Amino acid sequence: MNILLTNDDGIHASGLRAIYNELVKLGHNVFPFAPTVERSGASNSVSLNVPLTTQDVYDGDFKGTAINGTPVDCVKVGLAKLHENPPDLIISGINAGHNVGTDILYSGTVAAAMEGCVAGIPSIAFSRPREEVDPTQSYAEHAANLLKKIDFSLVPKGQILNINYPSISIKKTLGIKVCAMSTQGWEHKLHKKKDDNGKPYWFISPYIPYSHGISQTDVFFLLEGWITITPLMFNMTAQTTLSNLEQHSFT
């Protein structure tokens, strides 16, 4: 397959380099387009009306393109550069840190994959625990081999797969669980501070407020020790409310 590879951790991130190596070993043609620097939390943001520059990055057998933009910018530029031979698949990751629950709303990793499905291309986001329980290469090997087992005919256009590895060794996981997105996630603490000149500023830091997840969701199963697969879609229409409002009179 021709695969467009991206992330939000940046072109030099170990997760991107590791899965690149594994995909190439399996015979795939891999084209990395990733941010010049880390852009975690960028979500679906795009750089409007500002120059986006690209730089070829060579490191041993690795060849990729660094872009001074967001993860979504990287996918857009990548698709433009590959327009004569479009990718069969877009992979975002492997991210350092889980993207489950409401984290998904802020995730540049998931947003990059979602940009792929907006373009009508099958897309997957991979995330591992922030603390490396296993070497990054182990997650990459598992992720690359998992691709062979995914039946993309079961994933309609306009949807992606969001895959997360739990905070235990891959060998100790309970298996793979397909599950729904939780409404839990990171919370953000705001701290008011002052710089060296006494000028006040705000600092946002994330923390996890839960010790267990809402039953049968990605957070729950991840904490239980499962590898989670959650299908997501960019059509955010609330169908039940839509139907109810259609029956409502606004006159």
From Swiss-Prot:
PANTHER family assigned: 5'-NUCLEOTIDASE SURE, PHOSPHATASE, PUTATIVE (AFU_ORTHOLOGUE AFUA_4G01070)-RELATED
Needed co-factor(s): a divalent metal cation
InterPro entries xrefs: SurE (IPR030048), SurE-like_Pase/nucleotidase (IPR002828), SurE-like_sf (IPR036523)
Note on cofactor: Binds 1 divalent metal cation per subunit.
EC numbers on record: 3.1.3.5
Statement: the UniProt record of this protein carries the keyword Cytoplasm: yes
Species whose genome carries this gene: Lawsonia intracellularis (strain PHE/MN1-00)
Binding locations of a divalent metal cation: 8-9, 40, 95
Assigned protein family: Belongs to the SurE nucleotidase family.
Gene3D superfamilies: Survival protein SurE-like phosphatase/nucleotidase
Protein name, entry field: 5'-nucleotidase SurE
Keywords linked to the UniProt accession: Cytoplasm, Hydrolase, Metal-binding, Nucleotide-binding
Reaction catalyzed: a ribonucleoside 5'-phosphate + H2O = a ribonucleoside + phosphate
Enzyme class: hydrolase
Gene transcribed to yield this protein: surE
Gene Ontology MF: a single term: 5'-nucleotidase activity
Function (record text): Nucleotidase that shows phosphatase activity on nucleoside 5'-monophosphates.
Localization annotation: Cytoplasm
Annotated GO CC locations: cytoplasm
